[in-house]
């Protein structure tokens, strides 16, 4: 099952040329960029690990692509995404986020977990099959 987080997640994976165009768009808006990675595929996982430092005042997409490729090389079995932030109002609000790499192996999908709670109510949650393995060994 394909993880869907951020823009373009229902489309085929972006090529490097398409990624550069999105980075150029973010640069044209004076947005700060950063690269993040994770091996925890839960759809509500908002706490990805930051790769390097945020890229403020970048004028050339090559600098961002360098960081993306370094992260891809170091973390080939992880998800990698790019975030663009607008700090024009003094608040770092995410304006654009998209996945630039998925694990090299198949994404195993999610299991539905049912829990009976008070008054016979049922609560549902999902858990990735990949998260049953320890961090760093999921893909």
Swiss-Prot record:
The main place the protein resides is plastid
> What's an example GO cellular component term for this entry?
chloroplast
Q: Which UniProt keywords apply?
A: Calvin cycle, Carbon dioxide fixation, Chloroplast, Photorespiration, Photosynthesis, Plastid
Superkingdom classification of source: Eukaryota
The residues forming a coiled coil are: none
Q: List the disulfide bonds.
A: none
- One Pfam family hit: RuBisCO_small
Which HAMAP family does this UniProt record tie to the protein?
RuBisCO_S_bact
Q: What does this protein do?
A: RuBisCO catalyzes two reactions: the carboxylation of D-ribulose 1,5-bisphosphate, the primary event in carbon dioxide fixation, as well as the oxidative fragmentation of the pentose substrate in the photorespiration process. Both reactions occur simultaneously and in competition at the same active site. Although the small subunit is not catalytic it is essential for maximal activity.
- Miscellaneous section: In this alga, in contrast to plants, the small subunit is encoded in the chloroplast.
The entry's family comment says: Belongs to the RuBisCO small chain family.
The protein's name in its UniProt record: Ribulose bisphosphate carboxylase small subunit
Source organism of this protein record: Guillardia theta
